Amino acid sequence: MNQPQTKTQQNLQAAFAGEAMANRRYLYFGQLARKLGNEEVAQLFERTADEETGHAFAHLQLMYPESEMTVEKLLQIAYEGEMYETEQMYPTFAEEARQEGESAAVAEFIEQGAESREHAERFKAMLQRAAKQFKAFGRVEAAHAKRYAEALEKVTAR
């Protein structure tokens, strides 16, 4: 999905990333606040995280309009994202962390890269399975259409 992007599309991606990160950060902060004994602050973070999710979804709806999406497109976009993480992002991050002597970060990036590959493989397998199913459905629909056409021809020939 390497298409040229407008500045607005880039801004939507950045806004989505910010809202999604805020959601995860606030959920984490809520857990920490609860462990530290402050339930009121934990709930504040959790409510705010829910609102951030709404903001992120609003951006996603503009980035990936429902009217333009198919199951195949969704799976392909997800696959490409996971492959980017596997082949480019995490290896680069791991190397940079290695150069800076951040061994815990190196291990984290390597582990996440491996998990991203697993995710990519799952999306690819489902994409292949869906393609086979749609191909089979196409044959079934063609057979039905042929029978309908034959039946219509018999009825109109009378």
Give residue spans per PLM region:
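Non-heme di-metal
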Residues: 1-158
